Amino acid sequence: MAEKYMKRYHVGLGNVGSYQVSARPWVSSSIHVPYSGAVGNVNGASAANRAVVNFPYVTKFVTIRNDGPNVHGATLRGAFSENGVMDSNANYFILSGAESFSADFKVTRLYLMGHDGNYTAGTTVTTASVIAGLTGIEAGLLSGSWNGHGGV
């Protein structure tokens, strides 16, 4: 991967200016959040039962909003690694209907999954919107994943 960037200048994760300037806006709405079917399952949910949001550049900040109504069955969980969103790891946050979460995190991927174990009618628990501010740092420079790191 290093060869790809050897002959040109680019900013990296430690470039302070990339975080001081205004971020490039990025929005995705009506993201269908699938039902996990995994509550109580010690093996966790399958990889197919999650929505993945990929960012083209490293984020400066990210906001996740649960667009569903504040009723039973509209909760979602969000995580910053594929393993984190699973039941067995429980390294996720929960948003009830109409709640949102914002943070200044450097990420290139976000994982969303339905949370309510009693939901049975259909495959979509709720919908979500994601708003992010992008830096000029290419996503490929934040290599790998947060999987395997404590708390993620």
Question: Where in the sequence are the language-model features?
Answer:
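Noncatalytic modules at the cell exterior or secretory-pathway interfaces
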Residues: 62, 103-128
